[in-house]
From Swiss-Prot:
Organism: Oryza sativa subsp. japonica (Rice)
Targeting signal (transit peptide) range: 1-71
Any single GO CC term annotated in Swiss-Prot or TrEMBL for this entry: chloroplast
UniProt protein name: Probable 6-phosphogluconolactonase 3, chloroplastic
Family: Belongs to the glucosamine/galactosamine-6-phosphate isomerase family. 6-phosphogluconolactonase subfamily.
Keywords, comma-separated and alphabetical: Chloroplast, Hydrolase, Plastid, Transit peptide
Enzyme Commission designation: 3.1.1.31
PANTHER family per the UniProt record, alphabetical: 6-PHOSPHOGLUCONOLACTONASE, 6-PHOSPHOGLUCONOLACTONASE 3, CHLOROPLASTIC-RELATED
Domain of life of the source: Eukaryota
Pathway named in the protein's UniProt entry: Carbohydrate degradation; pentose phosphate pathway; D-ribulose 5-phosphate from D-glucose 6-phosphate (oxidative stage): step 2/3
Region named Disordered: 1-66
Function noted in UniProt: Hydrolysis of 6-phosphogluconolactone to 6-phosphogluconate.
């Protein structure tokens, strides 16, 4: 049996397990537990035990100069790294810190993954000191979007995450919520939303008091050169979905065509959002995302990522921000 198969769990199966567990216990069963201290080198230093890590450039930028004029721009933190290795180390530290804070507060850490190069950027979590320090048993893992293909298919975000991250860390199988790939795109999206609702009822997933949508602890997003995030593509009607938590598309401009995706109200209700964007091919979309000249009629999906609470943190490299004149 492959590593992926050994830890496989559909959202429906995992939800059922959670439901049975909670039938004799209140939702408050997910409670804060004593926080295991992270090594001091993890929280107080920018130096990896293996190699020096250069601090990133911190900026809040717009093409016309540092600093945006809107409230949304003020909630963007732009981190720029000289090398991908430094970005990966910083992203691991950021994720580990948020995990520790969530576990200390609620006894669980809910995180949503994307596909693409994001998983490679998370690889440091599988190494010391993060592998030992993070309370993996408290993690609950979701997918921001997924292709409706078998779990062992080359296009599966589940397979990508399993191969690069999840098979290398001790997260309980019942807390890894894959889609049911035997269903249609619509059926898989509906079932995934039902799963989320069950986990909200069980007290595993919080609800935003501001939006009424699920409030995951961390939403980890990538971005395509066209400015798409999740499976929310420019000009597609699902971009404007504001009632459903999880939706679907059958006509993705990138293969495979059938996918499920979190909607913007769910994405933007997260406690924390990280956008991991690298490469010169994405510089145009980054430039537009930080532009003060925006109208609602031509927004790229990445421009619609706007947290209701907290700060949106961009993890970038210099090629990705090369069109920002203030950098």
């Amino acid at each position: 049996m492959s590593a992926s198969a050994a830890v496989s769990s559909t959202c429906a199966a995992a939800s059922s397990t959670t439901s049975r567990r909670s039938s004799s216990s209140p939702a408050s069963r997910v409670q804060a537990t004593p926080r295991r201290s992270l090594p001091s080198r993890l929280v107080a230093s920018r130096t990896s035990p293996r190699s020096p890590v250069v601090p990133p450039v911190y900026a809040t930028a717009s093409p016309g100069g540092a600093g945006g004029t809107t409230a949304a721009a003020a909630r963007k933190k732009l981190l720029i790294f000289d090398a991908e290795e430094y970005l990966a180390e910083s992203l691991a530290k950021y994720t580990a810190r948020l995990s520790g804070e969530a576990v200390a507060e609620r006894g669980a850490f809910t995180v949503a993954l994307s596909g693409g190069s994001l998983i490679k950027a998370l690889r440091k979590l599988t190494e010391s000191p993060y592998l030992e320090a993070v309370e993996w048993s408290k993690w609950h893992v979701f997918w921001v979007d997924e292709r409706v293909v078998p779990k062992d298919h080359a296009d599966s975000n589940y397979k990508l995450a399993m191969d690069g991250l999840l098979s290398k860390v001790p997260i309980p199988a019942s807390q890894i919520y894959a889609i049911n790939d035997t269903l249609s795109a619509e059926g898989a999206a509906d079932e995934y939303e039902t799963c989320l609702k069950q986990l909200v009822n069980d007290g595993v997933v919080a609800i935003s008091e501001v939006t009424g949508f699920p409030k995951l602890d961390l939403m980890l997003l990538g971005m395509g050169p066209d400015g798409h995030v999740a499976s929310l593509f420019p000009g597609h009607p699902v971009v404007n979905e504001n009632l459903k938590w999880v939706s679907y598309i059958k006509d993705s401009p990138k293969p495979p065509p059938e996918r499920i995706t979190f909607t913007f109200p769910l994405v933007n209700s997260s406690a924390h959002i990280a956008l991991v964007v690298t490469g010169a091919g994405k510089a145009g979309a980054v430039h537009k995302a930080f532009s003060d000249k925006q109208s609602s009629s031509d927004l790229l999906p990445v421009e619609m990522v706007s947290q209701q609470e907290g700060v949106l943190t961009w993890f970038t490299d210099k090629p990705a921000v090369s069109m920002l004149s203030s950098i």
